[in-house]
Design a protein with these regions (language model features):
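Extreme N-terminal starter segment of soluble prokaryotic enzymes
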Residues: 1-3
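Short coil/turn segments at alpha/beta junctions that flank glycine-rich nucleotide-binding fingerprints
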Residues: 97, 114-117
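Acetyl-CoA-dependent GNAT
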Residues: 6-12, 16-94, 101-106, 110, ...
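C-terminal "cap" of GNAT-fold acetyltransferases
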Residues: 117-131, 136-137, 144-164
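Short polybasic/polar patches that bind polyanions
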Residues: 95, 112, 135
Length: 164
């Protein structure tokens, strides 16, 4: 049974594990292997604990048979009607089975229910699979690029946006 819900503080460890596992698969060949190999399952625990604890970010999870298989992390922007999708990840063995579509659709519904009218995100420009996924869900390219530093390497990210 699929369930999409708001993340709870007790989910933080599992969420961090999902993100780490997903990064190691999704970004292999895109991000430096040394950086990916250095990621531990608890890499995001402090960020999540702080962000969820002080409400600077909010998170949702997707469960399959009561197992957390994916997570989305979001942050309200300065424009109170706009939200930034910081991340949307699934466990690697759940990718390509329709869970991503189900999860994104549920997240979008929740964002609309919260009163958001626009969503932005950044995606590594070489992450073609993610770009296809987001464009299939109505995101458009803004032609804005930002730089990201992961480990000691620089990467270019493309900003996508969607009217909800």
């Amino acid at each position: 049974m699929i369930n999409i819900r708001a993340a709870r503080l007790e989910d933080i460890s599992k969420i961090s594990s999902v993100i780490a596992a997903s990064w190691k698969t999704a970004y292999r060949g895109i991000v430096n292997d040394d950086y990916l190999n250095s990621l531990r399952s608890d890499h995001w625990v402090d960020f999540l604990d702080s962000g969820l604890g002080n409400n600077s970010v909010f998170s949702m999870v997707i469960e399959n048979n009561q197992e957390v298989i994916g997570t989305a992390i979001l942050k309200e922007t300065e424009n109170k009607c706009e939200v930034c999708l910081i991340s949307l990840y699934l466990l690697p063995n759940k990718i390509g089975q329709g869970f991503g579509h189900i999860f994104y659709t549920g997240v979008e519904t929740e964002l609309k229910n919260k009163g958001f009218s626009n969503c932005i995100l950044d995606v590594l420009e070489n992450n073609k699979r993610a770009i296809r996924f987001y464009k299939a869900h109505g995101f458009i390219d803004t032609d804005i690029e930002i730089k990201a530093v992961l480990g000691e390497c620089n990467y270019t990210c493309t900003i996508l946006e969607k009217t909800l």
